[in-house]
Design a protein with these regions (language model features):
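Hydrophobic transmembrane architecture of multi-pass small-molecule transporters
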Residues: 110-203, 209, 214-218
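Transmembrane core module of solute transporters
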Residues: 1-106, 206-218
Length: 218
């Protein structure tokens, strides 16, 4: 999201940080609440809620255009942050629920490593898709920008290099926005595809008098 805001919306770095910061606040609040609920309710239900809330935020982002108000960016970010908070905490609790205490240090290292690897792969895939789709959509849009297009010739002087440069900039912006929307759509589908996998997650109920499971987070 920050690269999109800076490259397409022209947001300064400081403004980008301000409009995306509420997402982190939503995550923090959700993690505090989720930490209190772990051990008191089925973690699968918490994970389900987290994934569905995240999917709602991504669905809203699929409607992004080049004309966005800051509230259009802030609220989906807050919703997504809340969803992620309800995913991270229960997921960590499930990971360490059946792990022997003497193995938790090693388990924390492996868990953090795998999560970082997964995040890196996900970011790389999304960035590659954005770059590729931008080029594909750009080529598709340019096909219709030729002297045979009467509406284009009527409104623009295609013999002017300045006009051609301006048109190319406009097409690139539109292509980039479509590519980002397609990326949000891909993440939306991936989030929904994860939901059925919750059926194989084992939920360990806390016995009477047993302390709530410790949650290891970075």
């Amino acid at each position: 999201l920050p690269p999109m805001l800076e490259a397409l919306m022209g947001y300064p770095v400081a403004t980008t940080g301000l409009v995306t910061a509420p997402s982190g606040v939503g995550t923090m609040v959700a993690m505090l609440i989720a930490g209190r609920l772990v051990g008191r309710m089925d973690v699968r239900m918490m994970l389900l809620a987290g994934f569905l809330v995240s999917a709602v935020a991504l669905y809203q982002m699929m409607g992004y255009t080049l004309v966005l108000s800051q509230s259009d960016i802030v609220w989906p970010g807050v919703i997504q942050g809340v969803g992620l908070g309800f995913v991270f905490v229960p997921l960590s609790a499930v990971t360490f629920a059946t792990l022997a205490p003497e193995l938790r240090a090693d388990g924390t290292a492996i868990f953090s490593l795998m999560r970082n690897i997964g995040s890196s792969i996900g970011i790389s895939v999304i960035q590659a898709q954005v770059t590729r789709n931008t080029q594909v959509v750009h080529a598709s849009l340019v096909e219709h920008m030729n002297p045979a297009n009467a509406a284009l010739v009527q409104n623009y002087d295609l013999s002017s290099p300045t006009t051609l440069e301006s048109l190319n900039r406009m097409v690139t912006q539109q292509a980039s926005m479509i590519a980002y929307v397609d990326a949000f759509k891909l993440m939306f589908i991936a989030t929904l595809c994860v939901v059925p996998l919750l059926a194989i997650v084992r939920s360990r109920r806390r016995a009477a008098g047993e302390d709530a499971p410790h949650v290891a987070m970075d």
